[in-house]
Amino acid sequence: MIAFHISPVLKVGVRAGPSYVLALMAISVMGIVTGLHSGCLPPPVDSGRDTPPASDADRSIAQNSVKMLAEGRETFRFDTFGSESFWGDALKLHQALAGSANGGVGPGVTPNQALQLGLKVDSDMLIPAVIESLQSGTLNLDDPLTTLDLLRADAVVGVKGFFDQNRTITSIGIQCALCHSTVDDAVLPGIGRRLDGWGNRDLNVGAIIAIAPDLSALANVLQVTQDTVRAVVNAWGPGKFDAELTLDGKGFRPDNRTAATLIPPAFGLAGVNLHTWTGWGSVTHWNAFVSNLEMHGHGTFFDPRLNDPVRFPVAVRAGLHDVRSNPDLITPKLAALHFYQLAIAAPAPADGTFVREAARRGESLFAGKAGCARCHVPPLFTEPGWNMHTPDEIGIDSFQADRSPDGRYRTSPLKGLWTHQKGGFYHDGRFPTLRAVIDHYDGHFDLSLSEAEKDDLVQYLLSL
């Protein structure tokens, strides 16, 4: 077994900052650019109208689109927003990853252990020799030093290591892609090309937090011990995170199950109004919320609803309703980040992953007898407008809804549902299968669906 810390692993030019990404994105939309230079914009749809010559305004819009996509992707994949001051400087998570043999503490985290925690490796950031050694089994994945090499290569999806001139890790920050990207497993399980927007249902955020040597920053704001913090986050399990913990301090539900919720996808959001399971706000609101309050970046965030000592006592103590950092490392990035996210389409299922005839029958049921389309309105598969419902309307308890400002649950968009079956369905995974979801609604709305009709609905949902 070999480690690769002796030779570089980063592909030359793979990531040279926004200018490289801008060039790459420009290539991907070359058809648009070519059309602009020829004086015409290619018609996006068959409108039946003649396409007029492109104006200066048309060119400006198209060129800005290319720029926004490139900058947004760079932000989504690689920007820490200064969060290393929390994850590294405060929690000292980088020390636990490195281990005592590499200037840190404890045994360290090997690549195999990191993969078991649900972290992913971007194979596009690795030179061919490293990929070959991964596939042949000659790369040492049981050495924390190899983990550090992967961090130096910017190959760990959603995690950024900071190193001094002696190649010693000094801090660590996180990126949007940590929770909202995965990989295609093209090289090995957990190692492959990025799939932006896919919720990482393998990621055990709580277990990662729990290994940090110093949780006093969280313990102090929650007014509990560090051991209590570890007990709470270790209960989350893979694919879950509790964004409200540092707002209301509720680590567990009344039934003693974790209060954490499933990590949602960040694709298919174009045309969708409210975001998150309980509709905290639009995508733009949630990006600002998460980057400031959950990632612990340095920016500006204002939401007076959090200034409520009864509902959000922890948020009030921490002043989270009005955050203003100088310098602001987040706000200048939000517009392009939003643009990129809205461009991520929900992925279509592969042929053979659902039964087409059954799906066609299920589509008729979805729009007709089952009444699903009343709330999950095609083609958005959520309601245009204020897509929120009370717990009683959908037949579940109010615990998670009560942790949000509006006390309701969002109608989740359904496209790409096949990508995030792991961990169950609904906000907390209470329904283990799509069939269980349909059984719930069949009883709640007295639909009288037959067993065959339920099966057809499942196939239709898998086809979206």
Report the location of each language-model feature.
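Periplasmic c-type cytochrome electron-transfer domains
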Residues: 2-11, 19-21, 28-464
